[in-house]
Design a protein with these regions (language model features):
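Membrane-embedded alpha-helices and immediately adjacent juxtamembrane helical segments
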Residues: 1-279
Length: 279
């Protein structure tokens, strides 16, 4: 729970600077409309009760003049980088604890690894949201015949694929120190975690919309509480994927060891069954 709380807190601290950076980037490189659609594509993954937090912030940033956006982006970059770095440090610490790593990284190496993972996660998030936006634009222009033929016209399929790829790489390269986690274990953990993330998002939406009325208890901060609940459930899913990858790795190791033992016994029996000649 300590790791889940740390990741959730720093994710909450980093998400608004990330939205500001995305909008500023598209304002400079492309246009405001694309930036708005990109931000809305990201907002749709959170429960409906928490979307108001982001929608009001996105509308404010879209309407703000360029010089204010530039100044806010500089501050957002500093705050977001700090929060993302600390959040991914908590993720890596939790995963290494789950994997039962005894050989810990040094201070510099651990911080560098967390920084690299944060950069890769931000790039992957931008690519996936861009793919989702592209699919939407193609649906609007009725140009999805090729993708429909290949079964690639669903935006949720691209989001799920991005989750699987990102989590698989996380478990493969960042969870173990002494050696890499096998690909089969990493992929199994990535697929399992991605499925759990989808289920957790759906269950959280049902919980906060139909089971409890958080607004009556928490008032104006109810949306923040909803977002924290959603974050904590999804972080638990990521850690469960790490545990699943670890168990698959152990099972693969035991299977290989049993096969090696059986082969050794077979060779020993074969050598004993060979006729011996005494001269």
């Amino acid at each position: 729970m300590l790791y889940v709380g740390g990741v959730s807190f720093f994710a909450l601290l980093a998400v608004f600077p990330a939205v500001a950076l995305i909008i500023a980037f598209f304002k400079v490189v492309l246009n405001t409309g694309v930036g708005l659609e990109q931000a809305e594509a990201l907002i749709e993954v959170v429960p409906h009760a928490a979307r108001g937090l982001f929608q009001s912030e996105v509308e404010r940033l879209i309407e703000a003049p360029f010089h204010k956006i530039s100044a806010q982006s500089a501050v957002a970059l500093i705050v977001g980088a700090y929060a993302a770095h600390r959040g991914f440090k908590a993720v890596l610490a939790g995963l290494t604890f789950i994997h039962d790593e005894t050989d810990q990284h040094g201070f510099f190496r651990f911080n560098l690894l967390a920084f690299i993972v944060a950069i890769c996660a931000f790039v992957l998030m931008t690519v996936v949201s861009g793919a989702v936006l592209t699919i939407r634009l193609m649906h609007e222009t009725q140009e999805t015949e090729t993708l429909e033929g290949l079964g690639l016209d669903s935006e949720w399929m691209w989001a799920f694929a991005g989750l699987v790829i990102g989590l698989t790489l996380l478990y493969r390269f960042a969870m173990a120190h002494s050696k890499r986690v096998p690909w089969r274990a990493s992929i199994g953990g990535g697929v399992g975690a991605a499925i759990l993330l989808a289920l957790a998002s759906w269950a959280c939406a049902v919980y906060v919309d139909q089971v409890v009325e958080l607004g009556a208890t928490y008032g104006s901060v109810g949306a923040v509480v909803v977002f924290l609940i959603w974050l904590s459930w999804n972080v638990n899913a990521v850690f469960f994927g790490g545990a699943l990858a670890t168990e698959i790795e152990i099972a693969l190791h035991e299977y290989r060891r049993a096969n090696d033992f059986a082969e050794a016994e077979s060779e020993a029996d074969l050598s004993l069954s060979e006729p011996r000649h005494f001269w």
